[in-house]
Amino acid sequence: MESEFFSEIVQTIIQQKLSKSQATKLKLKLCSKHKLKRVPTDIEIMLRAEEQNIPSLKRVLQTKPTRSISGVAVVAIMCKPHKCPHGRCTVCPGGLDSEFGDVPQSYTGKEPATMRALRHDFDPYLQVFNRLEQYIVTGHMPDKIELIIMGGTFPSMDKRYQTGFVKYALKAMNDFSSMFFRKNNLNLQKFKEFFELPGPVGDEKRIDSITRRLKKVKLSDSSLAHEQKRNESSNIKCVGMTVETRPDYGRTSNGIFALSLGATRVELGVESVFDDVLDKIDRGHDVQEIIDSSRELRDLGFKLNFHYMLGLPGSSEKKDIEGFKILFENPDFRPDMLKIYP
């Protein structure tokens, strides 16, 4: 049914020389006729069209995908699984040798970003490239990227690894731009050819073919400073970068290094504002460490996103509510953002 839909809409748009509004009405009508479960984006229609028909379709359909509503597209990538510097908290599900296998700290391996990372062996270049491809195919223009580096306490990892990880994440954005954009417009035909589209999403042969080509591009010589400079004029710009850390690794020295990588926000693993609760889950630091870390990171200019957990051992509903009041009434805390975990 899908193939019949795409064939009919392409032929009708070209033969009847429809306007944009007419094409939109036709799309809805044909979706009903062919019993499609969702309405394809304009770019999906062009991806399904023959090369000779694309110029005619471009005059009717949008020439490039729409932006995300906020104007910024989030790209979340995972660093490789590594041991937490203090050991494992009692409530942490992931990490090396966990019941879920070797997965990033604090994750189960079932999250979309984790599954994407596992597919690409935690390679930042491949993770970013894959996410950018997904954005284009689903009709979004990822020209402004907020990069979120997940997977545990990133500042605890070897500084060479951190540098290389960010370098290749930025290189993926820059290479994607230089490969598929011409005069600020997406070269749809080149994009189709490189990613072998349209094609089955989970086809291993297709994935292997694309991965081999990407690895060849990735290996060209570069440095973090070079990729940061390239990104200033890239069509895919990194406008924000987030790293995750425990408070005891979120101090001034690590903060300064994170700034050199380009980080603008820190997701801080606060979890609780009560020493007895932190002690009960073997957190390995106290509330004062959270306060000191928050102050030092703010002084460096970072925005702070606290991770906070409810229902921890040693806590209660009443204590959780009290904790929220402390978070927002006490000036030692007051995060810019908050992630709540059960």
Place the predicted regions along the sequence by residue.
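Conserved non-cysteine loop/helix-boundary elements of the Radical SAM core domain that shape
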Residues: 110-126, 147, 151-173, 181-305, ...
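Gly/lys/ser-thr-rich phosphate-binding loops in alpha/beta enzymes
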Residues: 67-97, 311-337, 342
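Flexible, acidic/Gly-rich N-terminal and inter-domain linker regions that tether
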Residues: 1-217
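Short, functional N-terminal and low-complexity linear motifs
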Residues: 54-59, 91-100, 132-140, 221-224, ...
